[in-house]
């Protein structure tokens, strides 16, 4: 079986640049996921983020999660749970405006560390978007500019912990879905696994690696690339032992950004005969639809947006 794509970003600076770019392109076309090493974020920064995130969970969130589990009677379930996930989360919004000062449970050291980490992730996300542009034959910054609404992009981090689960066969850590947004950068636990992606009808483990960043593509990049790159179904399997940490940072279009296939990637004949596979829409409209259909296939969402495009009153 094919190996999960691992990209060494340092190789972009030397004789292996062409081969590395080809590897990124293949990962985007055939996996929708890849894992970065030597990505430029210092290991000591990642170690500090991990230490403080795990400490925050133990101090502020672990007991709340135990109380929620007890309240819902989840430890004694006998049938599959399909309406919730075995995860404890909070969300840090970075752009267009930050909420990090408003979250009550974070101490000042954690806030400052996460502000620094966010800047590094934002820079990396934009560098990756430019690499995708290069592979796609689009002008530099095309994707970044497409993501810019009137207030810039949306960027935020979902901080998740997946505690030990007594019934991992009946409760998912996170149910299968594709991500709605643009490009997602994941800093995950290297000791407790659980993330899987769907490839060729099989669930494949995303290997946990120390100090790596896992990258996956969201629905918006599938639309903009006219299907050349794909968003892929993925899930988190709950584990009986160990608490898994996950920080998923979503670099998404701004709410009023207009999303549609890049003209350079659209077949002219299909365009002339109005046989477009992908719709044109405002990102916020897609997110409103996604909120109710997250754990379903993406194709009906695209079709619903096409219907809205042709008859907005019918969907309103």
From Swiss-Prot:
The keyword Nucleotide-binding does not apply. This is 1-aminocyclopropane-1-carboxylate oxidase 2. It catalyses: 1-aminocyclopropane-1-carboxylate + L-ascorbate + O2 = ethene + L-dehydroascorbate + hydrogen cyanide + CO2 + 2 H2O. Residues 153-253 form the Fe2OG dioxygenase domain. It holds the Pfam family 2OG-FeII_Oxy. Leaves. It comes from the Eukaryota. One of its GO terms (biological process) is fruit ripening. Gene3D superfamilies: B-lactam Antibiotic, Isopenicillin N Synthase, Chain. Belongs to the iron/ascorbate-dependent oxidoreductase family. It is an enzyme of class 1 (oxidoreductase). Induction: By wounding. PANTHER family: OXOGLUTARATE/IRON-DEPENDENT DIOXYGENASE. Its EC number is 1.14.17.4. Keywords: Ethylene biosynthesis, Fruit ripening, Iron, Metal-binding, Oxidoreductase, Vitamin C. Its cofactor is Fe cation. The lineage of its organism: Eukaryota, Viridiplantae, Streptophyta, Embryophyta, Tracheophyta. The gene is ACO2. One of its GO terms (molecular function) is metal ion binding. Fe cation binds at residues 177, 179, 234. InterPro entries: DIOX_N (IPR026992), IPNS-like_FE2OG_OXY (IPR044861), IPNS-like_sf (IPR027443), Oxoglu/Fe-dep_dioxygenase_dom (IPR005123), Plant_2OG-oxidoreductases (IPR050295). SUPFAM superfamilies: Clavaminate synthase-like. The keyword Ribonucleoprotein does not apply. Pathway: Alkene biosynthesis; ethylene biosynthesis via S-adenosyl-L-methionine; ethylene from S-adenosyl-L-methionine: step 2/2.
């Amino acid at each position: 079986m094919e190996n999960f794509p691992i990209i060494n970003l340092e190789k972009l600076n030397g004789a292996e640049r062409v081969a590395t770019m080809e590897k990124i392109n293949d990962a985007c076309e055939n996996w929708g996921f890849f894992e970065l090493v030597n990505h430029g974020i210092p290991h000591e920064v990642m170690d500090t983020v991990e230490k403080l995130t795990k400490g925050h969970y133990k101090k502020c969130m672990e007991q709340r999660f135990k109380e929620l589990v007890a309240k819902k009677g989840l430890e004694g379930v006998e049938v599959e749970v399909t309406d919730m996930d075995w995860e404890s989360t909070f969300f840090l919004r970075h752009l267009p405006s930050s909420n990090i000062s408003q979250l009550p449970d974070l101490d000042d050291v954690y806030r400052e560390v996460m502000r620094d980490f966010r800047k590094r992730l934002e820079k990396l996300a934009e560098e990756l978007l430019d690499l995708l542009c290069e592979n796609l034959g689009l002008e530099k910054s095309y994707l970044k500019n497409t993501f810019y609404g009137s207030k810039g992009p949306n960027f935020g981090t979902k901080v998740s912990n997946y505690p030990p689960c007594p019934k991992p066969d009946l409760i998912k850590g996170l149910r299968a879905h594709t991500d709605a947004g643009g490009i997602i950068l994941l800093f995950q636990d290297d000791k407790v696994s659980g993330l899987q992606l769907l490839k060729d009808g099989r669930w494949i483990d995303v290997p946990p690696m120390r100090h790596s960043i896992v990258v996956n593509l969201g629905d918006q990049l599938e639309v903009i690339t006219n299907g050349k790159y794909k968003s892929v179904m993925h899930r988190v399997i709950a584990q009986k032992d160990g608490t898994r940490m996950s920080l998923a940072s979503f670099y998404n279009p701004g709410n009023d950004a207009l999303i549609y296939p890049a003209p350079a990637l659209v077949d002219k004949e299909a365009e002339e005969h109005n046989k477009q596979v992908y719709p044109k829409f405002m990102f916020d409209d897609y997110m409103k639809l996604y909120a109710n259909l997250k754990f379903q296939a993406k194709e009906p969402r695209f079709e619903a947006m096409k219907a809205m495009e042709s008859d907005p009153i019918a969907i309103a």
